[in-house]
Swiss-Prot record:
This is Transcription factor bHLH119. InterPro entries: bHLH_dom (IPR011598), HLH_DNA-bd_sf (IPR036638), PIF1-like_bHLH (IPR047265), PIF3-like (IPR044273). Pfam families: HLH. Residues 522-535 have a biased composition (Low complexity). It comes from Arabidopsis thaliana. It comes from the Eukaryota. The modification Phosphoserine is found at residues 274, 541, 543. Residues 50-59 have a biased composition (Pro residues).
Amino acid sequence: MGEDDIVELLWNGQVVRTSQPQRPSSGKPSPTPPILRGSGSGSGEENAPLPLPLLQPPRPLHHQNLFIREEEMSSWLHYSYTGVTSTPATHPQSSVSLPPPPPIAPSEDDVVELLWKSGQVVQSIQTQRPIPPPIFRGSGSGGGEETVLPLPPLHPSHQNIFIQEDEMASWLYHPLRQDYFSSGVASTSATRPQSSASLAPTPPPPSVPYGQIPVERRTENFMNFLRLRGNIFSGGRVEAGPVVIESTQIGSSATPSSSAAESCVIPATHGTESRAAAITGVSRTFAVPGLGRRGKEVATETAGTSYSGVNKAETERVQIQPERETKITEDKKREETIAEIQGTEEAHGSTSRKRSRAADMHNLSERRRRERINERMKTLQELLPRCRKTDKVSMLEDVIEYVKSLQLQIQMMSMGHGMMPPMMHEGNTQQFMPHMAMGMKGMNRPPPFVPFPGKTFPRPGHMAGVGPSYPALRYPFPDTQASDLSRVHVPSLHSNPVPNQPRFPAYINPYSQFVGLHQMQQPPLPLQGQPTSQPSFSHASTSK
């Protein structure tokens, strides 16, 4: 294998070796593997080298797989590290030894990688627990020098497993940790008195004074002073009193140890001061409230170098109002809110009152109108004969019929005087006729025309086609001259022969009609010395 070839040693219950050569080995001689020498106290073999496997690692290939099968690495790891971690029985004075293993043993799923690069072995531990590497100090009985073998820093599992060459130089000359290889690598017995290798004592943790909380150094959200300002305003009022150290939370952390800023309140009599101090890289603000009425200012300053990305709004000063002014402002805001609410309620109340008043006026006027209509309907019901209907529509229909019957009566009376032409009776008017005589007997009877047998009674032209035609009388009328018309008794229109009777000639009592007819049927006695002549009907036909 070449110098740049990579060899991986994996731990999965046992040691696994793999080698990935990139190209065949050239004719150059392979470098001699490093030799670990231990110092003994008695024998002359103190410079005897500890055997290591003669490996020729191939050139590294970053794009190939670095994990290989277990059976290819099991023999290599066991052969190479048995001489380092164990002392042969033939060398009892060997001073290279390991301390007893810790009680914590690796699980079967832990993975340990050993890489070979540029002639050196590189270890990469794939575990979740960061354990500080022990410091081995070896001392021989012949020499007084002590050599410290430092371990390279362990890298977490999420970082790159390839390390720089200068960090890998000291790893090969240091024995592997026995807690990771307790099952595959032999360990040194703890009963040997000649062993001089020991672990360096771990320094005790620094004591924390009582009443102080260690603050971790955090850089996230460090330059965002808008959150600091918001916490100052939301932290409540600032009171003057004894010195109290409060922690202001920045971000979402709620623990005091992870807070990124602390504020200290210092009492003062008057004036305004602002102090900023940087403690362990964390900005702490000291606010000095005064007793005056003007607002107090708090300045925030960053420790260390300035940051060019800080906005102007983040570095501007923040004003904090005193307690009295805060109360006055809150009272004013509360009063304004109450006044706005009351004004809104009054506006709504006035609108609702106006609407209710208009509705009341409308209801009152509607009630009055209905009362007047009911009164008029009652009056109409009293005027109609034998009307017992309560429905308004039915009452109005009866009123219409009644008015029509009255109009017909007026027309009939006018026709009797010759003032206006007759009109035809409607079919539904006859039901009101018998009940509306009004003292006129026989008004619903046909007109009193005297039938003359054998002849038709002539009628005026405007009466043609109206009503039935009556035949003429069989009995002749006496022949009267025009001069003798005064002798004929014609009832006067102004005379009232029968009391309580109407003065209309067309509407005469039937008894009077019968008497008149009987008188007309009696022929008059002929006068002596005058020839008898037939009565002329020309005058009778024309006279009425």
